[in-house]
């Protein structure tokens, strides 16, 4: 696995002209809630001039309910089933940048689909960064517990070894959203089967 921050930056030719890039596979952003998958993925998609999709938004649109409402009414197993169905549909589409929910990559079937049809990018963040980003948000059903920070810590501990199976990893900590998107693009540039440039 290559960490994006360690990849040599690519963007402009020596003559100053912009390097053109063509996305050949869907880029699937994975990682914990609060890692920045939606913000960074959206910025990456703009830079690559491809669509940006959010699997949670697609699930909400299909169910006509919010994620929190789905969890409350139908439970997590039902949500995970719908999540896999939506993920399969989105992966069959044209190459894009796809943000997934924090638990999507936990299912082996989802990891297999992503591996076969796209490339996974893990936005890696530590507990303090994640907690700072999610502590004031009421839209995280898994954190509706007496001690949400401890719940987040336990989720991070359980999920990190699975996220580590992603094709690429990029640190999601310091820097702006745009800077993190550049790091992801640098990581993708190491995979010519995913990102083709005119260099």
Curated annotation (Swiss-Prot):
This enzyme's EC code(s): 2.7.1.71
The protein's location, in the record's own words, is:
Cytoplasm
Q: Name one GO cellular component term.
A: cytosol
Keyword Magnesium listed: yes
Q: Look up the record and name the pathway of this protein.
A: Metabolic intermediate biosynthesis; chorismate biosynthesis; chorismate from D-erythrose 4-phosphate and phosphoenolpyruvate: step 5/7
* Binding-site list for Mg(2+): 38
Q: What is its main location?
A: cytoplasm
- Where, in this chain's numbering, is substrate bound? 56, 80, 102, 159
What is the uppermost EC class here? transferase
Query: Which keywords does the record carry?
Result: Amino-acid biosynthesis, Aromatic amino acid biosynthesis, ATP-binding, Cytoplasm, Kinase, Magnesium, Metal-binding, Nucleotide-binding, Transferase
| Entries under Pfam families matching the protein | SKI (PF01202)
Q: Which cofactor does it need?
A: Mg(2+)
Cite the GO molecular-function annotations of the record. ATP binding; magnesium ion binding; shikimate kinase activity
The record's Gene Ontology biological-process terms are:
amino acid biosynthetic process; aromatic amino acid family biosynthetic process; chorismate biosynthetic process
Record note on cofactor: Binds 1 Mg(2+) ion per subunit.
Biological function: Catalyzes the specific phosphorylation of the 3-hydroxyl group of shikimic acid using ATP as a cosubstrate.
The record's subunit annotation is:
Monomer.
Q: Which family does it belong to?
A: Belongs to the shikimate kinase family.
Q: What is this protein called?
A: Shikimate kinase
Q: Which organism is it from?
A: Cereibacter sphaeroides (strain ATCC 17023 / DSM 158 / JCM 6121 / CCUG 31486 / LMG 2827 / NBRC 12203 / NCIMB 8253 / ATH 2.4.1.)
Gene that encodes the chain: aroK
């Amino acid at each position: 696995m290559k960490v994006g921050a360690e990849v040599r930056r690519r963007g402009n030719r020596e003559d100053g002209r912009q390097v053109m890039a063509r996305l050949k596979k869907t880029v699937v952003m994975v990682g914990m809630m609060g890692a920045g998958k939606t913000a960074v993925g959206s910025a990456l998609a703009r830079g690559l001039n491809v669509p940006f999709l959010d699997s949670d938004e697609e699930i909400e649109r299909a169910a006509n309910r919010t994620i929190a409402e789905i969890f409350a009414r139908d439970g997590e197993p039902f949500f995970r089933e719908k999540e896999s169905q939506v993920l399969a549909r989105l992966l069959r589409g044209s190459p894009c940048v796809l943000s997934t929910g924090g638990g999507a990559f936990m299912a082996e079937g989802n990891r297999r689909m992503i591996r076969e049809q796209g490339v996974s990018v893990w936005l890696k963040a530590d507990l303090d960064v994640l907690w700072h980003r999610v502590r004031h948000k009421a839209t995280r059903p898994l954190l509706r517990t007496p001690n949400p920070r401890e719940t987040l810590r336990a989720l991070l501990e359980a999920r990190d070894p699975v996220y580590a199976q992603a094709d690429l990893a990029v640190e999601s900590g310091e820097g702006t959203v745009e800077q993190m998107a550049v790091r992801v693009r640098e990581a993708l540039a190491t995979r010519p089967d995913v990102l083709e440039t005119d260099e």
